[in-house]
Amino acid sequence: MPSTSEVGHAKNVANFADIIAYCTAYGTTYNPSKTALQLTSLNALLTSAQTEIANVTTAKNTFDTVTGDRQLAFEPLKSLATKILNYISVTDATSQTIADAKTINNKLQGRRATPIDTTTPPPSEGAGGGISVSRQSYDSLTENFSASIDLVSSIPSYTPNETELTVDSLTTFRDNLQTANTDVINAEVAYSNARISRDNILYSENTGLVDTALD
């Protein structure tokens, strides 16, 4: 009976429901002395298991939805970062400020500050796998975009006519990125907790649905 794939979890619960149906069909001849095997207990366990399966499905759907929402929220980031850099380049910002802006933009675009030496083989996985080519995690992207906002805020002549490039608009955009990322983190935690709770009901030693079925 035991199966631990996503489909398998539901199958285990369905099989348990079949077992209860057979036990119920026996009528009064099914009268175990062990409380956990009595029909009231079996039905209660089945209800709990069905609830946990449904909770996992709901949590996964939520996680998938907010993950897609986050991807959409971050989609304009690179092109917006390029527009910011282009505007900074025509202000009276110092050469160092422009250099800093280029560094931030490189991070947002996922570029290295210096080219990779393609003549040197990359470290093997056994050696630790090497350093990531880019800082493309959503946390890092948000952090670097915040740095870009701080930088343009320090340039007196940064007064774009384009609404999307104003500090207020950039701040709103950054806040939306943070919200989208936080939503995914929270949904991931909820999804993980739902799976843990489901597994406790289904697979706990002695008291879980699977072990109860094997009794």
What annotation goes with each model-predicted range?
Residues 1-215:
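Basic/polar low-complexity intrinsically disordered segments
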